């Protein structure tokens, strides 16, 4: 998610789950090739398993980024074909590319030929007024011809002409049955459900016929949802850290960062950690004032120490 799943958020996520596969923000190839490559690509080994998610429509540019990423420890590279924002549409990448399967094939072929990583795609059920019963199978079949076999499927259409990104996450109806049918039709592909998923345990049972689940906004707005991922989905021990311990770890992590902008982003990412708690608003206010933050750290820890010793 753009402006959400940066390195600071991923550090927070790793306080809650050691097993969940994390994604970078969607990063446009031009930002990497013409910007600060270290800023966009470097990460700590603790963030793995980690997927680099790219946006773009130029096979040559995508291949160059793949070559760069060969030197960096990513587990997978994902081409985003599902983002519906106006900026993405005007730049002809994201969900807009679902209308151009031949170009997508060229992009993916270039990525596969120049990468030593697994290549995957993130898609929607379709765009605008497409008939998802016909167009989706055709699109997936064409993409699979490149050798890509991992599809993260947001179980909604993307309406590119009329709806905002927020509305595109809410107004087009969820159609999980279409995702299930996709798996039945393409048994050899890995089909991972995305969209509207808010409960790990329920989702494990509801999507047992698929190859996995992908959680986006809910994992950002309520990071504590990740606290039981390891035991429920990976049959491993949960990290079982208290909110106090997680908060202290984040504060110690911020002390290692050199740029104020990184710390500010990290503080914002922490807001959802306290959702539903009695003192959530007070804690968010304390986190929001960067100039006061260092003085407020002990007050925040005290609030958590006194009232919230339960496991996250």
Predicted features along the sequence, with ranges:
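Short, hinge-like loop/turn segments at secondary-structure boundaries
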Residues: 38-43, 95-97, 137-139, 168-170, ...
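Alpha/beta enzyme core
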Residues: 15, 63-77, 81-93, 102-189, ...
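Short glycine-/acidic-enriched loop or helix-start segments at secondary-structure transitions
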Residues: 7-8, 33, 64, 88, ...
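Active-site beta-loop-alpha junctions enriched in small/polar residues
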Residues: 1-3, 27-29, 55-57, 82-84, ...
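Hydrophobic faces of well-ordered beta-strands that scaffold small-molecule active sites
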Residues: 22-24, 50-54, 77, 119-123, ...
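Alpha/beta catalytic cores of nucleotide-metabolism and tRNA/nucleoside-modifying enzymes
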Residues: 2-3, 8, 106-109, 114-116, ...
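Glycine-rich, positively charged N-terminal anion/phosphate-binding segment
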Residues: 1-75
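Short, basic/glycine-rich phosphate-binding loops at helix/coil junctions
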Residues: 44-46, 87-88, 159, 281
């Amino acid at each position: 998610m753009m402006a959400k799943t940066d390195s600071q958020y991923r550090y927070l996520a790793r306080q809650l789950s050691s097993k969940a596969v994390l994604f970078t923000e969607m990063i446009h190839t031009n930002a990497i090739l013409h910007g600060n490559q270290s800023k966009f690509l470097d990460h700590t080994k603790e963030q793995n398993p980690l997927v680099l998610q790219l946006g773009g429509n130029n096979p040559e540019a995508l291949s160059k980024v793949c070559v760069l990423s060969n030197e960096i420890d990513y587990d997978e590279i994902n081409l985003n074909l599902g983002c519906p924002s106006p900026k993405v549409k005007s730049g002809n990448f994201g969900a807009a590319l679902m209308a151009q399967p031949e170009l997508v094939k060229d992009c993916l072929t270039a990525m596969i030929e120049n990468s030593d990583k697994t290549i995957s795609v993130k898609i929607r059920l379709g765009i605008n007024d497409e008939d998802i019963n016909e167009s989706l199978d055709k699109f997936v079949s064409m993409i699979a011809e490149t050798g890509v076999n991992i599809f993260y499927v947001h179980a909604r259409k993307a309406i590119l002409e009329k709806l905002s990104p927020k509305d595109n996450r809410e107004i087009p109806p969820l159609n999980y049955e279409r995702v299930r049918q996709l798996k039945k039709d393409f048994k050899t592909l890995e089909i991972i459900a995305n969209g509207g998923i808010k409960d790990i345990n329920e989702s494990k049972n509801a999507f047992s016929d698929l190859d996995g689940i992908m959680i986006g906004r809910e994992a950002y707005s309520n990071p504590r949802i990740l606290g039981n991922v390891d035991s429920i989905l990976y049959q491993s021990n949960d990290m079982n850290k208290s909110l106090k311990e997680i908060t202290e770890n984040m504060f110690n992590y911020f002390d290692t960062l050199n740029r104020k902008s990184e710390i500010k982003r990290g503080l914002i990412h922490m807001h959802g950690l306290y959702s539903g708690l009695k003192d959530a608003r007070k804690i968010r206010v304390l986190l929001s004032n960067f100039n006061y933050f260092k003085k407020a750290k002990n007050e925040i820890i005290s609030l958590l120490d006194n009232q919230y010793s339960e496991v996250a």
